[in-house]
A protein has these predicted regions:
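Phosphate- and other anionic-substrate recognition elements at nucleic-acid/protein interfaces
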Residues: 2-260
């Protein structure tokens, strides 16, 4: 997908009130990144599809591709990479429980079918996972790709996890330090006056690092977790993307046509 022309990409993060969408334009031969639009949170994922229709790639912080029974997914690889910060990654729910509305029943069924319980954190975002899964197809997945912001920050931070929580002042500063060389006026973007109601600074930073990763996908400068993803029962790849990294220890590789 490499290109020398300007193009638009997007990063999407789940937040209070729905989905936060950061639409970014990548300009010129030097590939500068400029935030062009960040509307108030969008309630339904179907509207996210419409809002990002002009974007080449959209990276989303939500599981895409789900197992029906086992923990086939990429979550374990992400945990291994993040080491002592692996608590940031939650195992995705199995597809048969997506419509469950009560945690005890979802947890019980998950344990029965997969041998593993369901974390309360995963249950709390299960409605969003269901929204995405209900519309996602292998063809749509060519443009809509899964990321985990902490894995993206790991890649941008020279293979070192962010050690401080994103909800703390110190953690936000750590992540802004990584993103500041990429996005001009980052401080202005995250100021309270420029944030929609209910949107937190860490929501914006997660959406921006997802958007940056989308740009790297267009430029063929990205990695996948695992290096050779499996497909689920719908034919969706179970993978997490991040900016290019090369760490055979964890099975993180550039695409096959790029050398490490």
């Amino acid at each position: 997908m490499s290109t020398k022309q300007s193009f638009k990409i997007a990063g999407v993060d789940g937040c209070k009130g729905g989905w936060l969408v950061a639409i970014v334009e990548v300009k010129g031969k030097r590939h500068s990144f400029e935030l062009t639009c960040m509307p108030p949170p969008i309630t339904n994922f179907s509207d996210v599809l419409w809002a990002t229709k002009g974007c080449k790639v959209v990276c989303i912080d939500i599981p895409i591709g789900l197992s029906d029974r086992d923990r086939w997914r990429c979550d374990q690889k992400a945990k291994e990479i993040l080491g002592n910060r692996q608590c940031c990654v939650f195992f995705a729910p199995i597809r048969p429980i997506l419509s469950y509305k009560r945690y005890p029943a979802a947890n019980r069924t998950s344990r029965c079918l997969s041998g593993h319980g369901l974390s309360i954190q995963s249950f709390n975002i299960m409605d969003k996972i269901h929204q995405v899964d209900s519309v996602m197809t292998p063809n749509k997945q060519k443009r809509f790709r899964e990321v985990h912001p902490e894995v993206c920050f790991w890649a941008l931070n020279h293979g070192q996890p962010m050690q401080r929580k994103k909800t703390t002042d110190a953690g936000r500063k750590d992540r802004m330090r990584v993103l500041a060389p990429i996005f001009q006026n980052l401080r202005g973007i995250v100021t309270k006056d420029n944030r929609a109601k209910g949107v937190k600074v860490d929501d914006i930073l997660d959406a921006l690092v997802a958007a940056y990763t989308a740009g790297q996908v267009v430029l063929d400068n990205y990695s996948t977790l695992p290096a050779r993803p499996q497909r689920d029962g719908k034919g969706l790849r179970m993978e997490i993307l991040c900016p290019a990294a090369c760490d055979p220890k964890f099975g993180v590789l550039k695409p096959p046509h790029l050398s490490c």
